[in-house]
Amino acid sequence: MRAKLTIVLVVALLVSTLATGCGPAPTPTPVPTAVPPTQVPPTKVPPTPVPPTATPAPTKPPAPAAIEIGASIPLTGKFGSLGAQVKPGYMYAVDAINAAGGVYVKEFDKKIPLKLTIYDDESDPTKAVSKLETLYAEQKVTAYLGGAGSDMHAATAAIAEKNKVPYLGIAFALYQIHQKGYKYLFSPFPKSPAQGKDVYEYLNAQIPEGQRPTKVAIFQEKTDWGIELGGLWKENAPKYGYTIVDYEEYAPGTKDYSGMILKAKAAGAEALFGMPTMPDGTAMFKQMAELGWAPKFSLIIRAPENVAWGDSLGKVGEYVTIFPGWHNGEKFPGVAELNAKYQAEFKRPADLLTGPAYACVQILANAIERAGTLDRDKIRDAIAATNMTTVVGPVTFNADGTGNVLDPLVQWQDGKMELVWPLDQKTADFAYPAPPFNER
């Protein structure tokens, strides 16, 4: 019975299931289809203009208050008489440039005054070296100005080279300084090679053949410059028709020259060439007068370059000639103004070394302006390229730093130093021959 009932229930359940599956399917709830959004092109908005940033003009470095330059000069000691002529030349030139506002330097776009520091080296090369080192370390100088005397410059030029500071110097004729390969040394002043031949050329140009003092005595100082110049006089003599009949050597500071004088007199010397200091030169000529030897022509470089020569020797010092590097009678621009300033202070026209010293500052200022900077190397290059007229006339430089400058011959006449060569610059005629001392 239970089995039948179970079968009936299963059948009923199955029928019910089939009936449900055969009925209509229910309507599904519609699901909205996603419609892609309409693509609207973006509106192009122009960017906000940004004004360009102005490039600032390069700022110039601040200009120094002054252009520092420095000099070591023998104002005392054996070269003191020379240094006394050099110092005013430097100072007057600096004053003149500063009165015009200074030196224009393009790097700073303005004129800057020169500031000159001067030390007295007491004619001592060791002290001169020390002074230049001080100028370099403390004043930080843009350029050096030299002192006076060949052995002084020989010492100081080496310091300029070591420190790579441009150096302008005069009052020295020693050529060998320029043969050391120095790049910072410049000298607008005649050197031994010129003096060693110019004397013969000038004599031959002014004295007729047959009247020339062809027998020459040389009194050579035992110094580097003495050896150099004496050797050139000796070497060049035969080329111009002259003979060296006596060649004497002496140490600086010698007191007795009588032996040398008597030998020259006995050899029949008609001309005397020498390069003594002021004390040696005056002693030499006083003894020549005492011994009665008056050469027809005397070229005595250095000693007679100071007015004290005339004061000390009077007529004994007359007729002597010099190669001083300049004379205040030269007709170049600026000479008259220099003489006027010197006259106001010293009651005479400018001394022989004052003009060349003045020219050094003119050359330096011109070079700084052309360089457009205070860079020492660029100033050095500008000095090397110098081509200008100064109070000593036209100036250019050779590769070794020697200057191409006038080499004037000056002669003592009537208590004054007169310019006798070149002829277009002369202030007096050449006086020749020199009479005996007792006939003056």
What does each model-identified segment do?
Residues 70-91, 119-125, 148-151, 219-228, ...:
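Extracytoplasmic "Venus flytrap"
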Residues 82-106, 231-238:
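Short, polar/charged alpha-helical segment
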Residues 285-358, 369, 374, 419, ...:
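Extracellular/periplasmic periplasmic-binding protein-like sensory domains
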